[in-house]
């Protein structure tokens, strides 16, 4: 039993959203292997990639008040001022926006950047432009959240990309969520924007790689203390 437990703990968990896709890929692989080794092995590779895409590893989240953690694995593509999506009703003036681009090899489970109450969730259908383009924030399919935390409101927007065609949300309005806890997933390549008050101290730079729930994007506290607790989730 201890050996099985050790093996189970060593495997990266797969999110349940991926089960149907993995099952389809496995069935296709089995079918192709019976008629063609070459195409069958390609299908096996696709099945493995599909399983890796939906991996959902645990993360260790810093919990000090004032910290804003990355909502997504990926690369910081943009940092600057921008108007948040109109449907969120978050602000009529530009806010600080940090954009994280996720490629098809990143973990695509998204995590809350701060602890707080989910005040609003707003979904908007749209196009599927390259998620790295600035206008993707305005034109693409997206799902936005407003989280009211101890330091005010934070906007988080999941944006579909060229390949991504489905945004999945795990949460509902009125729920309380902790920093680093899972709130959604975007299938097959996408972007996540975080909107913060102007003047918030940014601790990352464009081009930097991020780990959802772990990388500290910003800090509301201008003179932070060194005392930080952590949570694994």
UniProtKB/Swiss-Prot annotation:
Instruction: Locate the coiled-coil region(s) and give their ranges.
Output: none
Where is the major localization of this protein? membrane
| Reactions catalysed | a 1,2-diacyl-sn-glycero-3-phospho-L-serine + H(+) = a 1,2-diacyl-sn-glycero-3-phosphoethanolamine + CO2
* A GO molecular-function annotation: phosphatidylserine decarboxylase activity
Kindly list the biological process annotations in GO that this record carries: phosphatidylethanolamine biosynthetic process
- Is this entry keyworded Calcium? no
Q: Which domain of life is it from?
A: Bacteria
Q: Which cofactor does it need?
A: pyruvate
Give the keywords, sorted.
Cell membrane, Decarboxylase, Lipid biosynthesis, Lipid metabolism, Lyase, Membrane, Phospholipid biosynthesis, Phospholipid metabolism, Pyruvate, Zymogen
Where are the residues marked Cleavage (non-hydrolytic) as a site? 189-190
Kindly give the InterPro entries that the UniProt entry links to this protein.
Answer: PS_Dcarbxylase, PSD-A
Residue numbers annotated as active site: 190 (schiff-base intermediate with substrate)
| Record localization | Cell membrane
HAMAP family on file: PS_decarb_PSD_A
This one is known as Phosphatidylserine decarboxylase proenzyme
Organism of provenance: Azorhizobium caulinodans (strain ATCC 43989 / DSM 5975 / JCM 20966 / LMG 6465 / NBRC 14845 / NCIMB 13405 / ORS 571)
């Amino acid at each position: 039993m201890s050996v099985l437990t050790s093996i189970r703990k060593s495997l990266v968990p797969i999110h349940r959203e991926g089960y149907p896709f993995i099952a389809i890929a496995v069935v296709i692989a089995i079918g192709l292997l019976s008629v063609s080794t070459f195409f069958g092995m390609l299908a096996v590779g696709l099945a493995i990639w599909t399983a890796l895409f939906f991996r959902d590893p645990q993360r260790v989240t810093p919990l000090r008040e004032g910290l804003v953690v990355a909502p997504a694995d990926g690369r910081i593509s943009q940092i600057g001022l921008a108007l948040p999506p109109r449907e969120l009703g978050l602000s009529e003036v530009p806010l600080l926006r940090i954009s994280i681009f996720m490629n098809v090899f990143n973990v695509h489970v998204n995590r809350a950047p701060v602890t707080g109450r989910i005040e609003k969730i707003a979904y908007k259908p749209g196009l599927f432009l390259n998620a790295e383009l600035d206008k993707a924030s305005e034109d693409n399919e997206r799902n936005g959240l407003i989280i009211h935390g101890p330091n005010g409101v934070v906007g988080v927007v999941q944006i579909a990309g060229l390949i991504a065609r489905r945004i999945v949300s795990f949460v509902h309005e009125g729920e309380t969520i902790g920093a680093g806890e899972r709130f959604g997933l975007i299938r097959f390549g996408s972007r996540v924007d975080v909107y913060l008050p102007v003047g918030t101290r940014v601790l990352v730079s464009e081009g930097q790689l991020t780990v959802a729930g772990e990388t500290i994007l910003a800090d509301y506290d201008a003179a932070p203390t060194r005392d930080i607790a952590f949570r694994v989730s």
